[in-house]
Regions:
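Class I SAM-dependent methyltransferase Rossmann-like catalytic core
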Residues: 13-35
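Conserved class I S-adenosyl-L-methionine
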Residues: 44-54, 72
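Conserved SAM-binding loop of SAM-dependent methyltransferases across substrates and taxa
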Residues: 55-67
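Helix-to-beta-strand junctions that scaffold the AdoMet/dcAdoMet cofactor pocket
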Residues: 66, 130-131, 145-147
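A short acidic, Gly/Pro-enriched loop at the edge of an enzyme's catalytic core
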Residues: 109-121
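A short glycine-rich, Lys/Arg-flanked "PGG" loop and its adjoining helix->strand segment in the class I
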Residues: 135-147
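Conserved beta-strand signature within the Rossmann-like core of class I S-adenosyl-L-methionine
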Residues: 148-155
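Core SAM-dependent methyltransferase catalytic element
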Residues: 173-176, 188-211
């Protein structure tokens, strides 16, 4: 029985890898990244922050779409995702010919920036991987967002991970945030319902709004 479970687990991981591979037929990761990046809009001279940038894919895609703005991708990198690094991000940016992006080691739980440092904050499938209070992580990212700045955060916003997100959205609105909403992305927007169910990302959504 144990061997059977192990085989099924390996098969699931292989199928997941093929689905998300940039070189595969479906290229789901690329589709999601471009979907998030398409909602990232910065004014000329604006500053954008990508929290938990990993390989730099979202930072680079967003920077390409906003050539007159500057993007910063931050991540802890390290053992959990050993294949990702600051050097890899920089290499990927060079390969894409993108010069308006740079990368820095930083922790999403305590970002090394003053309040209201950025015009936009974005992220893709990051906070659910960090143990602890995920709403507090969101608050930390919003702390560095300037008044009038936009946030575009994509993650798995299930109740057991994030708690009551409707109450969180209401609290933001009560504080003066505008156009705050959760947009489901696993209903065909980024991911097919059938894919999302077996990948266990059915609660994927974009958290967007203006501070």
């Amino acid at each position: 029985a144990g061997a059977g479970i192990g085989f099924l687990g390996s098969a699931w991981l292989l199928a997941l890898y093929r689905l998300f591979s940039y070189n595969g037929k479906r290229q789901l990761a690329r589709h999601i990244i471009e979907g998030v990046a398409s909602r990232v809009q910065l004014p000329e001279g604006g500053r954008g922050l990508d929290v938990g940038c990993g390989s730099g894919a979202l930072s680079i895609a967003a920077a390409k779409r906003n050539p007159k703005a500057a993007f910063l991708g931050v991540d802890r990198w390290g053992q959990d995702y050993a294949s990702f690094s600051q050097a890899l991000c920089e290499d990927n940016a060079r390969a894409e010919g993108v010069r308006n992006v740079r990368f820095l080691r930083a922790d999403a739980r305590q970002l090394p920036f003053p309040d209201e440092s950025f015009d936009l904050v974005t992220s893709n499938y990051v906070y659910h991987n960090i143990p602890g209070d995920r709403q507090a992580l969101l608050r930390e990212s919003l702390r560095v967002l300037r008044k009038g700045g936009r946030f575009v955060i994509h993650d798995i916003f299930s109740r057991h991970i994030y708690g009551d997100m409707q109450a969180f959205l209401q609290s933001l609105q009560d504080e003066g945030y505008t156009e705050v909403r959760l947009i489901p992305t696993a209903d065909g927007l980024f991911v097919k319902r059938s894919e999302a169910k077996w990948m266990m990302i059915a609660d994927s959504a974009l958290l967007i709004g203006i501070k």
